[in-house]
Regions:
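N-terminal cap/lid segment of alpha/beta-hydrolase-fold proteins
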Residues: 1-27
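Alpha/beta-hydrolase fold nucleophile elbow
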Residues: 104-116
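Conserved alpha/beta-hydrolase
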Residues: 48-76
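Residue in the alpha/beta-hydrolase core beta-strand immediately N-terminal to the catalytic nucleophile
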Residues: 64, 111, 135-137
Length: 174
């Protein structure tokens, strides 16, 4: 049997509440797996996997990143993290959930799984906060030619400058 727990915590953006979920197995927990989801996803998309792993004694947990799933703020802007230093804020939200889990379930091996956009967040996370993690799964990741990345970043900056930080970018998506 696996028990689903939903809860909220304060985002590091200082304004928003983050929706998080734990799928907690009955009995002894052998491992905690934190899922860091991809672009245009939400953590409950991983529920079938979480239920399966829960039956094997693995607690699965994760949060909806800012602008995703049930963590979409009052502005209703899907996919928009925040205005100030979004990459750092999202990584710090992932870290906050890890700390909460380790405080509530101390001494249990901890693994983090990053999929797609979540793989980039996870790699950034591991660079900043890798201690206390016994394993990492990076899947659906990728790399692009430097010139293409620079071009996309330039387009994003121009759109942000003229259209505002919360504007939905045209031509830059999945």
């Amino acid at each position: 049997m696996v028990r689903k727990e939903e809860f909220l915590f304060d985002s590091r953006d200082g304004k928003s509440r983050i929706h998080a979920v734990r799928w907690v197995p009955e009995g002894k927990i052998c491992c905690i797996l934190q899922v860091v989801h991809g672009m245009a996803e939400f953590v409950e998309r991983y529920e079938p996997m979480a239920m399966y792993l829960g039956e094997k004694g693995i607690m699965v947990t994760g949060e909806d990143h800012l602008g995703h799933g049930k963590s979409v703020g009052e502005n209703g802007k899907y996919g928009f993290f925040c205005e100030q230093d979004p990459a750092t804020v999202v990584v710090r939200d992932v870290h906050r959930l890890k700390k909460m889990n380790q405080e509530e379930y101390p001494g249990i091996p901890y693994v983090i799984l990053g999929h797609s956009m979540g793989s980039f967040i996870t790699r950034n996370y591991l660079f900043r906060y890798g201690t206390g993690i016994q394993g990492a799964i990076i899947c659906g990741t990728g790399s692009q030619p430097k010139a293409l990345v620079k071009l996309c970043l330039m387009i994003e900056r121009v759109q942000r400058l003229f259209l505002g930080a919360g504007h939905v970018a045209k031509g830059i998506d999945k």
